[in-house]
Structures are given as structure tokens and as C-alpha cells.
């Protein structure tokens, strides 16, 4: 992954998303996932999501990272699932209102990657 590719998404701002907002197409998914290759598309309960696991040396560092993700979520008004475990944080982004992936999810995934830098 190039930092420039990730920055292309991370420099963008989430837009307000409503129930009738379009989900990303298969073509858009291929393009956008190429910009954040450490993220894995997952389908749960027929809902496409983006997921990534981050590893840390201990619980305290994982907790600090989870807090940073929470602050990002509030600033973007877009909220992921965050699973905090000893030495590990799993972040899952999807757009609840449309039941799938929107460009906002990719923007937030890219911004999440930058939190560890």
C-alpha cells in the first residue's frame, strides 16, 4: 500500500448518508479496497462490511487506539464496531442506514489506518 493512495481517501470527509444513499458498486469496491488493502470485505447477515485487526503489545496500547477510533467516529459522525481485546483491536466499518458499504466506510477505514502512524 502506498501512503499516497491511503491519503487520497483519508483526506476526504464523510458526507451525510441517508437510507436511499447508494451502496458502493462491485466496480467501486474493487477500486476502493485497492486503496486500503489491509482491510477485508466481510459479509455478515447479508451486510457487506470492512474489517481490520490491529495488533498491540498490550491492553493499554490497544485501549488507547480504540479511544482514537472512537474520537474519529465522533468527528466524522460515522460509527464502527470496535472490539477491544488484550493486544488487539478489531474495527468494522459499514453504513447502518443503507445496510452495506458506502464511500464513507472507505474514508473512515483510511483515516483509521493513519491513527497508528
Swiss-Prot record:
Substrates-to-products reaction catalysed: (4aS,6R)-4a-hydroxy-L-erythro-5,6,7,8-tetrahydrobiopterin = (6R)-L-erythro-6,7-dihydrobiopterin + H2O
Pfam families linked: Pterin_4a
Keywords from the named record: Lyase
Record organism: Colwellia psychrerythraea (strain 34H / ATCC BAA-681) (Vibrio psychroerythus)
Primary enzyme class: lyase
Entry similarity comment: Belongs to the pterin-4-alpha-carbinolamine dehydratase family.
Stated name of the protein: Putative pterin-4-alpha-carbinolamine dehydratase
Keyword match Metal-binding: no
SUPFAM superfamilies: PCD-like
Enzyme Commission code: 4.2.1.96
GO MF annotation list: 4-alpha-hydroxytetrahydrobiopterin dehydratase activity
GO biological process: tetrahydrobiopterin biosynthetic process
